[in-house]
A protein has these predicted regions:
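A post-motif C-terminal structural segment
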Residues: 1-185
Length: 187
């Protein structure tokens, strides 16, 4: 969060004609998820929450900043309410804020996989192709609707930056030229 605050301070030039783009990533959450490390995932989530607070504080004061929070892909781990007493102590978490709500961490894929060479790998969770959560605040956040295909985050950001025909307040068809062939993509 401190690095994000400093980056915003360095990039923010009230006299500049154009704004700035800043991407912040929680780099270790993916590693923690692959390792089935629930404590690591929770710690990374807490850290990115602090980063988001810094970005939102700036956006609220600035009034012309779009903050988008999303993931580059989903993962198989979920932290969900648990009414089952059969969950092992290792996966049982207690929330200190409400005095003991029980949560459990579940991994939605097999605890093994096969690598590109055909070798059996263990202890690594998978990336599913599911939609990812997305949240936004500020101008253009009307294009951020709660969930989207992970590849569509590009269109949200490009529209906000007004790149390649993106429009403020709506998403148009995109055309990509490959050689002499034009392909239209729905955004």
């Amino acid at each position: 969060a401190e690095m994000t605050k400093k980056a915003i301070k360095l990039l923010d030039d009230k006299n500049a004609e154009k704004g700035f783009f800043l991407q912040v990533e929680s780099a270790s959450i993916d590693k923690a998820d692959h390792a089935s490390d629930a404590c690591g995932m929770i710690g990374e989530t807490e850290q990115i929450d602090e980063v988001i607070k810094e970005a939102l504080d700036f956006a609220k004061e600035d009034g012309n900043t779009l903050v988008v929070v999303t993931a580059d892909h989903a993962h198989t781990a979920e932290i969900v309410p648990d009414g089952e007493e059969s969950v092992s102590a290792i996966t049982r978490l207690q929330s200190p804020k409400d005095g003991g709500a029980i949560m459990s961490v579940g991994f939605g894929t097999q605890p093994w996989s096969i690598d590109a060479e055909g070798n059996l790998r263990t202890k690594s969770m998978q990336h599913p192709g599911t939609q990812v959560r997305i949240a936004g605040y500020g101008p253009g956040s009307e294009n951020v609707n709660g969930q989207l295909d992970q590849t569509d985050a590009f269109y949200v950001m490009a529209n906000a930056l007004r790149l390649n025909g993106g429009t403020e307040g709506g998403q148009d068809l995109w055309e990509i030229t490959m050689g002499n062939k034009v392909q239209s993509l729905a955004s």
